[in-house]
Amino acid sequence: MRAERTSFLLALGLLVAGIRSVHCLPENVVVKDQHRRVDGHTLASSNTDFAFSLYKQLALKNPNKNVILSPLSVSIALAFLSLGARGSTLTEILEGLKFNLTEIQEKEIHHSFQHLLQALNQPSNQLQLSVGNAMFVQEELKLLDKFIEDAQVLYSSEAFPTNFRDSEAARSLINDYVKNKTQGKIEELFKYLSPRTELVLVNYIYFKAQWKTPFDPKHTEQAEFHVSDNKTVEVPMMTLDLETPYFRDEELGCTLVELTYTSNDSALFILPDEGKMRDLEAKLTPETLTRWRNSLQPRRIHELYLPKFSIKSNYELNDILSQLGIRKIFANADLSGITGTADLVVSQVVHGAALDVDEEGTEGVAATGIGIERTFLRIIVRVNRPFLIAVVLKDTQSIIFLGKVTNPSEA
């Protein structure tokens, strides 16, 4: 019965920009391309669809607030959880992640995430990016060998025996792990843990990159940012003259500027016309993103004004995931693929995120500039009102960060 079912918590997605991390794939795990998997485009499309669906729900629940999340991190964590799901619980998770199960098999999805994780963790001189998964397991809880093997091989998961009966000690252990992995950026992911907890799954993404054309700190000045019609705040406003991908979308009423990192990954800044934010949010789809990316063209922006900001978030996603059709994991779940018995349910889904944007990128040193072309149209872009930001990895077309900055002065 429900009251007797054992609960466990799922900690989703720690996106931390502007910090250091030491996690990497285990050296003894060799990924072999022996299995059919979802092609990169299909995986990216499903992940993008889920990203916008998740963002819209968070934006509705947090009106007029900053919204910061790592949709890719949430996708990976839910896919990781689905390793242990069976029956309709499994179907709900995968369909909630926007996979068409009439065209894609479960094993293909897992192998696609395996290859995505391998690609994300490839070492690079120009980008610091790592993805980590960890399990904190009640000391006497016996996991199925198959689940342990798949967790390690497919999702590169670490495992730590934990005494959840001493819930405060367990909470400190997990929070300290997260704090260490995020160099102190996220200090308290869990504010409470039940002594009945059996298993905690943690996923995080760490991203650090430098602008290809950095802003000069000498040109950063205090300027007005219009939070709403009746509220204005003073923020440090960076400024730059550069050639960069640009698109004016008259149909949706917004201006797009793409700033490239030295790794050729990019941050897409989307500035809606005044009063158009909600209309624009409603039209966020994978097709819209594809149209935008295909429409971006190099343009000389004579004056780009962008606020410098550092913002954090901490969300409980239970209600939001239920809105997206993922309900059974919270009650009447079949997670028998974890222990062999269907006595586990998810009691709490937590997602923490943080992002720093400054003159050098997401913390780093100045990078090489790019050439500037002459143009007769003088373009000035002032990002001085609420805007959207998406950080996209070029090679995998993955949105690792998606958010809305309503007030840059709020951490």
Curated annotation (Swiss-Prot):
Quick check: keyword Chaperone in the entry? no
Question: Principal localization?
Answer: cytoplasm
Organism domain of life:
Eukaryota
Q: Which residues form the signal peptide?
A: 1-24
Entries under SUPFAM superfamilies matching the protein? Serpins (SSF56574)
**GO terms for MF:** serine-type endopeptidase inhibitor activity
Task: Specify the glycosylation sites in chain numbering.
Answer: 100, 180, 230, 264
Positions of the record's site feature: Reactive bond: 377-378
**SMART domains hit by this protein:** SERPIN
Q: Where in the cell is it found?
A: Cytoplasmic vesicle, Secretory vesicle, Chromaffin granule; Secreted
Disulfide connectivity?
Answer: none
Do you know which CDD domains this protein is assigned to? serpinA3_A1AC
- Keywords carried by this UniProt record: Cytoplasmic vesicle, Glycoprotein, Protease inhibitor, Secreted, Serine protease inhibitor, Signal
Pfam families attached here?
Serpin
GO cellular component terms listed in the entry, alphabetical order:
chromaffin granule; cytoplasmic vesicle; extracellular space
Q: Which family does the record claim for this protein?
A: Belongs to the serpin family.
Assembly and partners are described as: Homodimer.
Briefly state the protein's biological role.
Serine protease inhibitor.
Its recorded name reads: Serpin A3-2
- Give the source species: Bos taurus
